[in-house]
Amino acid sequence: MIFDEFSIKTLIRPVPDFPRPGVIFRDITPLFQSPKALRMVADSFIQRYVEADFTHIGALDARGFLVGSILAYELNKPLVLFRKQGKLPADVLSQAYCTEYGEAHLEIHADSLCEGDSVLLFDDLIATGGTLLAAAQLVRRMRASIHEAAAIIDLPELGGSQKLQDIGIPTFTLTAFELSDR
């Protein structure tokens, strides 16, 4: 299926003043209500990574799980879950990161990766990059490497993609929005 950025962008619902005044939240749930759009999104990532050399897909809590699990299945790769604090039942590694609301923690099971593994990180959106940067730190603490950080949406004005690229992590997104886009 051919990727149609316009079709995808029209299905990403802008929600003004959520979760706080002045923010335009980019709601991807309408993408999942359209089988055609979901297939277009998934197929675009699958085609990009079908011959790529990495060992695991790391999906970020929670919306990164939605497409990350499809990619893991289609590409026959193990899926590693990066969860919010307190959601994983076994031994974990934890990494603090800053959000626009304060500090949060991202966790991964301590036995999820081994030295030499290579991870494709996946989230729904790259904004400030805080969550993906925390995931990257966890991957590196486990002596694994990051193949790329991928997402459906980039908000380049918030600088997250640039922060990732500045520490040597390539990024790939299907579309981008300016903060003022409605």
From Swiss-Prot:
It is an enzyme of class 2 (transferase). CDD domains: PRTases_typeI (cd06223). Keywords: Cytoplasm, Glycosyltransferase, Purine salvage, Transferase. It is found in: Cytoplasm. Pfam families: Pribosyltran. The keyword Glycosyltransferase applies. InterPro entries: Ade_phspho_trans, PRibTrfase_dom, PRTase-like, UPRTase/APRTase. Its EC number is 2.4.2.7. One of its GO terms (biological process) is adenine salvage. It catalyses: AMP + diphosphate = 5-phospho-alpha-D-ribose 1-diphosphate + adenine. Pathway: Purine metabolism; AMP biosynthesis via salvage pathway; AMP from adenine: step 1/1. Homodimer. NCBIfam families: apt, PRK02304.1-3, PRK02304.1-5. This is Adenine phosphoribosyltransferase. It comes from Stutzerimonas stutzeri (strain A1501). The lineage of its organism: Bacteria, Pseudomonadati, Pseudomonadota, Gammaproteobacteria, Pseudomonadales.
